[in-house]
Amino acid sequence: MINNKIGGRNMVGRAVNRLAGRLTAVALTAAMAVSMLAGCAAGGKNTETAAKKEDKPSAMEQMNAKNDPNVIQDNYRTCYEVFVYSFFDSDGDGIGDLKGLTEKLDYIEGLGCNEIWMMPIMPSPSYHKYDITDYMNIDKQYGTLDDFDALITECHKRNINVIIDFVINHTSNEHPWFKAAADYIKSLPDGAEPDPSECPYVDYYNFSKTNTGGYNQLPGTNWYYESQFVDSMPDLNLQSEAVRGEIDKITSFWLDRGVDGFRLDAVIYYNNNNQTETIDDLTWLVNNVKSKKAD
C-alpha cells in the first residue's frame, strides 16, 4: 500500500512536470516569434534608411559638384604625354601613328586627362624626331596632315587640348636650311667671311673658326658650327631676325590647324647657355604666340 501511494504521487508529479514543460515551450516560442517580428520590422527600417543614404550624393560628390574645374579661368590641365612612335599602331607596320592615337582618345579621356602633349611629330631622320627637317609637316611614319586635323577635331570634341613639342633650339643637319648654309661655307675661299646677303641661311646657324665648347667641325672646312647635343643637330641662331621670321610662320601654321599650345625643349641650352639672350628669345616667342592665341 505504501508503495502504491508513493507510485501514485510520482505519476501525478510527472504529469505536472510535463504540463509545465509544454507551457514553457509555448511561452518561449511566442517570445521568439515576437522577437523575430520585431527584428523584421527593425530590419526593414534599416534597409529603407540605407537605401535613402545610397540615393543621397556623398560628401565628396557634393564637393566635386561645387568645385567643378573651369579650365577657361585657371588653365590647369591633367596632361597625358604621348610618344607617338610607340603608343598605338593602327596599320600594322610596327610603329605608332596619329590614327592609332585617335583610336585611343576614349581611353585617355577615361583616365581623366584633358590635355595631350605630343612629343615631336614633324619629319625627321631619327626615331625620336627631335632633329627636324621640316617644321610644317607630319613625319610620314606617323601619318599625314589630314590625320593630324582629324586628331585635333576628335580631341576638341572631348574637351582635350593638344600641345606639341616645338624644337627650336636645333634642326637636323639634313634640314634644307643647314644644308644650304653648309654648302655655302664650304664654297668660301680661304680667308673669306660668310655673307648673309649671299646666303641668308648662313645666319640661321652659328658658325665660327674657333673650336669652342658645344661646337663641331664642318667636314671639309676649318669652320665649326654650334651643336650642343650632337653633330647631327646644329643649333639655330635664335637671335636672328630671319630665324624669328621662320618661327612666326611655323607657330601660325600649327595654331591655324587647331593646336592649343607648344612645349619647348631644352631651353637651358639655347644660345650656348646665354641666359640673357634666352630670356629675350622666350619673351619674344611668348608674345608672338599670345598675339595669335591669347590663352
Language-model regions, residue ranges each:
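Receiver (REC) domain switch/active-site residues of two-component response regulators
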Residues: 260
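Acidic/aromatic-lined carbohydrate-recognition and catalytic surfaces
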Residues: 40-43, 55-248, 256, 267-295
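C-terminal active-site rim and adjoining tail of enzyme catalytic domains
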Residues: 252
